[in-house]
């Protein structure tokens, strides 16, 4: 038997974006129906000052910081030789931290559960239908969810983006992959266990690592072209550097995830559907802004909800954030292109970073980290 449920607002997606949107709406007193399957959340993420400012607006900064590892620097090295290129020391007054994705999710769920106007439904949506009066979502079980407004927070390959832009407007197939692993800190050299971000630049590839879970684990992200991720890639990429030899252990489980090209949709809102998070902006991970910009989206919405009716707040959030996030997305994409330089170009890049020193790198990154959105 088909059930029909009517709600003022449905949030599609139960990941970081969906929960953040629900919290922004629920904190403003709006009844919210959060629909979707809780995603798997391995690994970690980094947060910069702009991300923490957004979390503060959502009253989430203290809870997440309690679970996070403070980072005091970014150290950049050559991946093949371990040669030190430069080091950026963070100002202690500015928060930089790393946290496990599961801890972030736990904090978001805990916050959402304190808001009585948020309800959860654990199901998979099959279809999103837009009309002039309401939006309808149909689950795989045939249940229908009708809403005055839908927040699409189900990612770049989600139904919400497809419904807003058209089924043929999905992100292009990625040419690059991120190999992600979470490893016990005790199994890695001391260099990995310091409270900092370690960026190692290679020939057509790069790796980022940082501590999470109170320093007990290290999150590693190795980015390279998809055609290089074949049998034996660990030995080829890590085997020549003694510092990285432990990473060739076949027991390490690497998650192969796509790196979609950077993209900000020009339109985030149509009819009764509004996109938020990476459904609206595909953010490369190279400046540690993926989750942070999602929190900025939600914080922007919360501020506007205190000033305007719901529909006007959604209009303004979509218009404002679709412009604001463009510069950061372009800079993240440019950083990725620099990091994945190969051959002689990669050697020239490393020489330039070494000669330019920390001031140049800090000015390049600080413009993003301190951005007032």
Where are these regions (language model features)?
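Conserved N-terminal helical subregion
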Residues: 2-9, 24-26, 48-165, 169-184, ...
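Residues at the starts of beta-strands that form the adenosine-phosphate
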Residues: 8, 31, 217
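Glycine-rich FAD pyrophosphate-binding loop
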Residues: 26-43
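Conserved mid-domain beta->alpha element of the FAD-binding
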Residues: 11-27, 151-152, 209, 253-340
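Histidine-centered metal-chelating micro-motifs
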Residues: 158, 178-180, 205-208, 280-281
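Conserved FAD/dinucleotide-binding core of flavoprotein oxidoreductases
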Residues: 85-105, 109, 182-256
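C-terminal auxiliary extensions adjacent to catalytic cores
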Residues: 353-373
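Conserved Rossmann-like nucleotide-cofactor binding loop
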Residues: 17, 40, 157
